[in-house]
Each structure stands twice: as C-alpha cells, then as structure tokens.
Amino acid sequence: MPRVLFGQAHAYNNYYTASDNNYAIGVGVFASMLVENNYFRDVRNPHQFMYPDRRPAYITATGNIYDNTSGDMDTGAVTPDGYDSVEPFTNPPYTYDLDDAEDIPFLVTRYAGPTVNEEKDITAPGAPVIIAPAESAVKF
C-alpha cells in the first residue's frame, strides 16, 4: 500500500482490499497526494495523514468508493505550528482516463496481472496492450 513522503503522488483507478491493513494510503512529511476514483473494500484508514502533529501534508480525494471501511479518510491540509502549508496536488502533468469507481473491482481483477495468453474481445481503459503474440514472447 502506498506511503508518500517528500513529494507529490497520484493514485487512481486502484482496488484496495485488505482486512488486516493499518492503512491503504499514507501521506506525510511534506507530501501531497491526489486520490481519485479508487475502490476501498474492507480496509482500515483508506487514506490518512501519517504525522499530522509533526509535519505538513495535503490529501485531495474525489470519486472514491468506501465499502465496509473504517477509520481515517483524511482530506485537506494539515499544517503544524511553525511550518508552511503544502500545496494541493490536483493537476498531474500527464493525461489519463478515470474509470468509474464502481467498475474498478471488476476491471482490476479481470485485467491486472498476467493476461498475455488470454483472448480478449474488449479493451478496458488502461488495460495492458499486447504488442507481440504470446508465441513470440521471450521465454526464460
């Protein structure tokens, strides 16, 4: 599960499911994170500030689904005394397509991981693209 320190990060179109976790996304120490269109199922602390009383951080969360979650779903800024605030990260410097959050469990469990030998008649947004037939793949 991602933890961000000293930078900007973007988590989108992810499926988080782990009933024994401490957190799904942790943001701390001069970090700013954009959390978009993810599906959180059976997790504690879907997104949380890691050191809210010691260092500034920022979380922007939008379009996510929280299914049987508990704990922190922190958003906004945390700025302890004596520190400047961290700017929100809301405009990644690249283009991307957001899937509907309710479709994420299906898309991730169906299209993530080793799928090179499977026949597909549809291409999901963000699905891996096969550029060579499986027969010609290098085998180790």
Name these PLM-found stretches.
Residues R3-F6, H10-F140:
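Extracellular beta-rich repeat passengers
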